[in-house]
Amino acid sequence: MASSSSNSWRYDVFPSFRGEDVRNNFLSHLLKEFESKGIVTFRDDHIKRSHTIGHELRAAIRESKISVVLFSENYASSSWCLDELIEIMKCKEEQGLKVMPVFYKVDPSDIRKQTGKFGMSFLETCCGKTEERQHNWRRALTDAANILGDHPQNWDNEAYKITTISKDVLEKLNATPSRDFNDLVGMEAHIAKMESLLCLESQGVRIVGIWGPAGVGKTTIARALYNQYHENFNLSIFMENVRESYGEAGLDDYGLKLHLQQRFLSKLLDQKDLRVRHLGAIEERLKSQKVLIILDDVDNIEQLKALAKENQWFGNKSRIVVTTQNKQLLVSHDINHMYQVAYPSKQEALTIFCQHAFKQSSPSDDLKHLAIEFTTLAGHLPLALRVLGSFMRGKGKEEWEFSLPTLKSRLDGEVEKVLKVGYDGLHDHEKDLFLHIACIFSGQHENYLKQMIIANNDTYVSFGLQVLADKSLIQKFENGRIEMHSLLRQLGKEVVRKQSIYEPGKRQFLMNAKETCGVLSNNTGTGTVLGISLDMCEIKEELYISEKTFEEMRNLVYLKFYMSSPIDDKMKVKLQLPEEGLSYLPQLRLLHWDAYPLEFFPSSFRPECLVELNMSHSKLKKLWSGVQPLRNLRTMNLNSSRNLEILPNLMEATKLNRLDLGWCESLVELPSSIKNLQHLILLEMSCCKKLEIIPTNINLPSLEVLHFRYCTRLQTFPEISTNIRLLNLIGTAITEVPPSVKYWSKIDEICMERAKVKRLVHVPYVLEKLCLRENKELETIPRYLKYLPRLQMIDISYCINIISLPKLPGSVSALTAVNCESLQILHGHFRNKSIHLNFINCLKLGQRAQEKIHRSVYIHQSSYIADVLPGEHVPAYFSYRSTGSSIMIHSNKVDLSKFNRFKVCLVLGAGKRFEGCDIKFYKQFFCKPREYYVPKHLDSPLLKSDHLCMCEFELMPPHPPTEWELLHPNEFLEVSFESRGGLYKCEVKECGLQFLEPHETSEFRYLSPHLYLGGSWIGNSSSSIEEIIHVDQEESSSDSEEIIYADQEESSSGIEEIIHAEREGTNRRKSVMRWIKVGARKMGLSLECLKPWTR
């Protein structure tokens, strides 16, 4: 609901009434009372009543602060009144119009349920009206009657009630919210969300929680809410800093609660000397009062028990709002209505910063890039944005540039003070977990943290993570990833720095590059150090580590020497160490060392505690000899260790789930011990150019992802797992996959691009994606592909010897066949209405094949992705065609107001690449053209001939016509096309356009003078129908032949699928007959002429 304070009001009150019931009695006295009190009321005496309310009445409702709805017995007999009520309730929702129902000699229940005499009048009014209009009236009546109003049974006399209504109106007018919070970015959305949770007009007592991290704006939202609505309650209180008021020294739990209640009631009732002697005081004083209570910054469940233990403590329609960092506190108090305050968007954050830095919503041009950097530095936290913005206000560009590096390394004092409150409230083990995440592990998965962090058990870590999440100190995503806000990470680093300000070697974690280099070079590390995280890109000079550097760091658990910039193999390594430099690290769980400079690990290295070994781009030739105790190892990453010749024995690494050996160009074979990796999920072997040998007959039951890209010497694929989901064999010398592949039950994708495949014999039944690009020796695609029910994408581009493509299953949604130079025949039609086709440079496609492609393009529901195929002219089924790159259609040819969906066709000239296309739609009254972009295909070679490019568009968003548009309908539509690519862009030689029905889904949803059936285009001649039936019979008869071939190629396990497909082929002919009959009716043909072909 938008804030009403932003409106320009003309009236205080808009009355809605049935004149014959109240105009000359009750209403006249009420209006006179309003006038005497200075209440400006809208009068409709001069307006002529009709069946619908006009623009003048709608404007009056929207320009009023309050609407008084006088329900009377005949109110519902007027469609005018009912439409008026709909508009009133709409304004209530959209702009905060206050609605006061008055029930004049009518029961609210009759209005709510449309019963009694009121209901009878309503039913008479509904006669002849649409269902939608009746539904809207009922909803408005019910919603309005649910608002608490004045019932005639509660009136002593009319004169007294008129005075009471007048008084209530004045109170509501005086309660108009101030503008103190109008300029706060995003506040309108926050208030709208809170209003939906509070349900201010509903009965009963409701408690709503606002939770989120410190500094995100919870208190500000609560204050804005209080400011807007406190006048609507008998009593109201904003009790700030509840956390601080609950720590009086020398008091027990009972005494603290008494003290808190006394402070609360004293402020609420404005009685300074009030004394509370028992914990029932709040209930005694407030059980009959409608109160608004804001409890700000609550951090202890006992505080809630003291101030709002039970809903029955408060009167009907009371509302309590609790702000806290701790979600679990709200859950523990059974508060089910909660609002989590999110960080502002990038644009909102920049606006907040600029309001405080420049006193305007956007930065000056010379400081724009710095303002964006400061906004990023603040991590979009509103508190930090306000503090940093105020700090930089009035300073010159040089001061901005000077301040940025300092603020990056140190928290502002005010921001730190606010954020540290949440940290200080943690238990010791939770603080320890917080520091681990802040310094080392932000962005990691929850399971990873359980493996890495030393604790009594996994549950201990899980519980701690949940506490941190509930207190808004971390964010847990659905996929298990753990994130900590940048300012909270900075807080954690500051806490660690203060552990030993002048001796970094005595801190828990080392992260600052300069300080870390000092500790390493001077050998000042101690047993306190648990982790080191050093970005080697920040090392200024070459750093030499001695043999004794790690000697005193006997408790070091995490060693992370990483490079934040891309690693170049020619890059000079600035960190050097002796051969025995790692011999003193028996507790290591994480060893991450990019570009490790030695060829071997020292002989004394003991990796028994290692969970992750990450040595990408290392100089390693060999890790170690013999069998090492690797029982805890989960991840081994040796990616781009180009000198690695041999992998160690991994028989003890039974928990390993990720093994990355990509770009290990000297590696010749995998050890036979790999068979022990029963928990291995990913095996990455891409670009292992010398790899020739993989152990055979091993079954890794957990293996799901397998990459052998560009293992150019690998000729055979081993029987390695039956649970693989992704198999990547790009650029290998493999000629075929093993027979067992057809039994794989989990495989989604097989990619054999640039392999040596000669024939495809075995394909899994559950396959979804099949890539066979650039297999130049491949000549045939097996017919049994049409029986793969999940197959969605096929890519046979650059398979230059493929002559025909078999019938494909209806599940296929993308077929790419670029530069298939020999492709001539397509068996079967493309039945998926959302399929995308790319036949660039398939110049030998026969006429029948092209007809099938055109049929698919004609009937399918496309998107902005274009279908491309050879062709010289726009097909005839595009009703509007033109030479050149634009087309104009006048309204005397078609009613342009009815259509927002189009199919377009371009003829692209030969000799250039298709790099995408810009399309602009001009209508007569568009302020500017609607622009769309047809993206280029991932593979778009030089066009060897003219090509057709076809796709579908919808002009978005559609809008109801304005009065001007109704009086001046569109007279033309112009569409222009311009291909992209600069000097090398394709020429648009012709273009065509076809209007589409808005939501029609049948094959005839296109408005065309032609009818397309079964592969041909027909007009009014029966001979065309005969040709179509012949085509379809030919197609159907080929089904049985294909089934015979498929039966020879398939195992007996596929028989049921084949029989099912045969039945589908039989049913298809019946479907075609039905299409013919429908088409004949559309063309005005007699069904008698169809009998010879439809028997």
From Swiss-Prot:
EC number: 3.2.2.6
Free-text note on domains in this protein's UniProt record: The TIR domain mediates NAD(+) hydrolase (NADase) activity. Self-association of TIR domains is required for NADase activity.
Active-site residues, record numbering mapped to chain: E84
PROSITE patterns: TIR (PS50104)
Any Gene Ontology CC annotation: mitochondrion
Protein's name according to its UniProt entry: Putative disease resistance protein At4g11170
Keyword NAD appears in the UniProt entry: yes
GO BP terms: defense response; response to ozone; signal transduction
SUPFAM superfamilies: L domain-like, P-loop containing nucleoside triphosphate hydrolases, Toll/Interleukin receptor TIR domain, Winged helix' DNA-binding domain
Pfam family, one: WHD_ROQ1
Gene Ontology MF term list: ADP binding; ATP hydrolysis activity; NAD+ nucleosidase activity, cyclic ADP-ribose generating
Domain NB-ARC: 168-454
Keywords: Hydrolase, Leucine-rich repeat, NAD, Plant defense, Repeat
Source organism of this protein record: Arabidopsis thaliana
Reactions catalysed, as given in the entry: NAD(+) + H2O = ADP-D-ribose + nicotinamide + H(+)
Location of the TIR domain: 9-173
LRR repeat windows: 609-631, 632-654, 655-677, 679-701, 702-722, 723-744
